[in-house]
Amino acid sequence: MAYTKISDVIVPELFNPYVINTTTQLSAFFQSGIAATDDELNALAKKAGGGSTLNMPYWNDLDGDSQVLNDTDDLVPQKINAGQDKAVLILRGNAWSSHDLAATLSGSDPMQAIGSRVAAYWAREMQKIVFAELAGVFSNDDMKDNKLDISGTADGIYSAETFVDASYKLGDHESLLTAIGMHSATMASAVKQDLIEFVKDSQSGIRFPTYMNKRVIVDDSMPVETLEDGTKVFTSYLFGAGALGYAEGQPEVPTETARNALGSQDILINRKHFVLHPRGVKFTENAMAGTTPTDEELANGANWQRVYDPKKIRIVQFKHRLQA
């Protein structure tokens, strides 16, 4: 019986783009438009070296009162102020042995099957990284205008009314919010309150949940805090389109295979360099030990500083309890 090796079925030139494309198709962050890229961010990520930060200058809005025109006074030129956002290139990788992929190797299209499993893995990892970043971002007082914490109040449960309160933390920019990320327990509570509608995608035919016309992303890696009295405090996040800047970098060797002769194992190695950045909150590197941040360092508020006006940051943190 012929033995199929990983190196026999993996063609890196085909495998790499397949994994990248499939990862974005599997992730609700990408499908809902929360994570979006642009030419500038892509170019910066491609040029960046290991662990490099990416500087993204921007122009502040023009402000000040208009000047009255008359025959005697000249207009006084006002300053146009610039600011700078900063993202970090995240470097990650993993390896899997032929034992892990044995069933997949025996299929009719093993490369696509393996690629789908690797893409699903990275979709989960990138979602986990986003929530680590948000934990760090919202641990700072400079994000107070984008936070609503009702968990300590008598009526601090997730409901239609409290959700509206959270949405309007952005004031007249509320309409920019297009999705909400929540724990499955929060989702269950919302379903029981008859707050969830399921909409069928016109292209894929897949039904996905929505709440007040906002797409729902359910993830059990969302924070849950248990207080001393046993009360659980849940964290949900509201997002706008493009709230996260996304770009793929260029690892020197994104995919390779290896052979462990002593263990009779083939090994698939996959590496990713990428940016997933909450736009408008600068990564400062103040508490980063290595060349690229760990999940714990991403969750450290010392590494983040708000630079955009609060209403321009299309993310709101909502802390609440659930209906008994």
UniProtKB/Swiss-Prot annotation:
InterPro entries on file: Gp13-like (IPR045404)
Cellular component per GO, a single term:
viral capsid
Which UniProt keywords are given for this protein, alphabetically ordered?
Capsid protein, T=7 icosahedral capsid protein, Virion
UniProt-annotated location(s): Virion
Query: Which Cys pairs does UniProt list as disulfide-bonded?
Result: none
Q: How does it assemble?
A: Interacts with the scaffolding protein gp11. Interacts with the decoration protein gp12.
| Family, as annotated | Belongs to the lambda phage major capsid protein family.
Task of the protein: Capsid protein self-assembles, with the help of the scaffolding protein gp11, to form an icosahedral capsid with a T=7 symmetry, about 61 nm in diameter. The capsid encapsulates the genomic DNA.
Q: Report what the protein is called.
A: Major capsid protein
Species this protein is from: Bacillus phage SPP1
Q: Lineage of the source organism?
A: Viruses, Duplodnaviria, Heunggongvirae, Uroviricota, Caudoviricetes
